[in-house]
């Protein structure tokens, strides 16, 4: 099975950080967000990746100087302009085997939703699309019948259900779904799903117990990192003066420099950032800008 990670969005909600890096490349602890996703899927047995890109292509080249990651091939699909959630999938379909589902993962989601459980439900229920869902919080715009395991509506577009669950940003899709794609190169995947919902071919699995973080805005990014536990909060190459005061939840990246006179609390310091003396609370510090929250 191949995993397709959506990385071509403009990332407007995460601006101004996405003026520096595409959203999937923002650092989470000591590596880019997308590498956490790839590491998890490698542990799940996936060994083949596709990533669509658009903005800041040079940053992608720096992050992946070769089209591989940990020995696994990575095919990069460059879009001159973002093709939306459906157009991006359509563009990479020639790279997708026709005899197995495609796993699609939103590039701003960090989760450990198990592929095996999603795949088992996909096959068991005869779905063409199976969505990972949540019911704990967030925007509930997916109608889901837990008794049947079927999705019954989305965004109340069919007038069936105003929404009981949230789409978790991960789904499986049989390649034959591409037969329903419009001729346009740029389009949303949602109308395709709605057509399949009417045919009873879209299922869902609720993963409220799984770890799940959306890196959608600077505040969501900071909160997600602060909520996660990691032994890699301070990179060993970082220089932290004895006169600097760092809160225990701060994350400091590679080759960052924090001089005496700095007080940091609940902050993320990106790699190669030279922090100026001062007091920072709930702040994301980068080599170019600081984002105060």
Language-model features: where?
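N-terminal glycine-rich phosphate-binding loop and ensuing alpha1 helix
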Residues: 1-60
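Residues at the starts of beta-strands that form the adenosine-phosphate
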Residues: 2, 47-49, 73, 101, ...
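Generic beta-sheet signal
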Residues: 6, 28, 52, 77-79, ...
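A structural signal for short hydrophobic beta-strand segments in well-ordered beta-sheet cores
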Residues: 25, 142-144, 204
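Glycine-rich phosphate-binding loop at the start of an alpha helix
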Residues: 35, 86, 90, 261
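Conserved beta-loop-beta/alpha segment of the NTase-like Rossmann-fold superfamily
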Residues: 60-146
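Catalytic-core segments of class I nucleotidyltransferases/pyrophosphorylases
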Residues: 100-103, 110, 115-123, 134-137, ...
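A structural motif detector for beta-strand N-caps
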Residues: 232-246, 250-252, 256-258, 262, ...
């Amino acid at each position: 099975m191949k995993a397709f990670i959506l990385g071509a969005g403009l990332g407007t909600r995460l601006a101004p950080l996405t003026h520096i890096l595409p959203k999937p490349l923002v650092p989470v602890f000591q590596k880019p967000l997308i590498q956490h996703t790839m590491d998890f899927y490698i542990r799940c047995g996936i060994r083949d990746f596709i990533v669509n890109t658009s903005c800041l292509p040079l940053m992608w080249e720096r992050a992946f100087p070769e089209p591989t990651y940990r020995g696994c091939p990575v095919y990069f699909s460059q879009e001159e302009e973002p093709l939306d959630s459906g157009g991006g999938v359509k563009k990479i379909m020639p790279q997708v085997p026709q005899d197995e589902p495609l796993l699609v993962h939103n590039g701003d989601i960090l989760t450990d939703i198990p592929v095996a459980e999603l795949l088992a439900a996909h096959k068991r229920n005869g779905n063409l699309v199976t969505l990972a869902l949540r019911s704990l919080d967030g925007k509930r715009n997916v109608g889901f019948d837990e008794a049947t395991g079927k999705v019954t509506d989305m965004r109340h577009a069919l007038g069936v259900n105003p929404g009981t669950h949230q789409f978790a940003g991960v789904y499986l899709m049989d390649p034959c779904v591409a037969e329903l794609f419009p001729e346009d190169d740029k389009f949303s995947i949602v109308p395709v799903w709605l057509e399949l919902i009417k045919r009873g071919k879209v299922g869902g699995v609720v993963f409220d117990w799984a770890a799940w973080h959306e890196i959608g805005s600077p505040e969501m990014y900071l909160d997600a990192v602060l909520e996660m536990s990691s032994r890699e909060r301070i990179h060993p190459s970082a220089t932290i003066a004895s006169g600097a005061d760092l809160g225990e939840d701060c994350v400091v990246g590679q080759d960052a420099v924090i001089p005496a006179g700095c007080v940091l609390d609940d902050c993320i310091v990106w790699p190669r950032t030279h922090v100026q003396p001062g007091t920072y609370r709930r702040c994301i510090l980068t080599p170019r800008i600081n984002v105060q929250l």
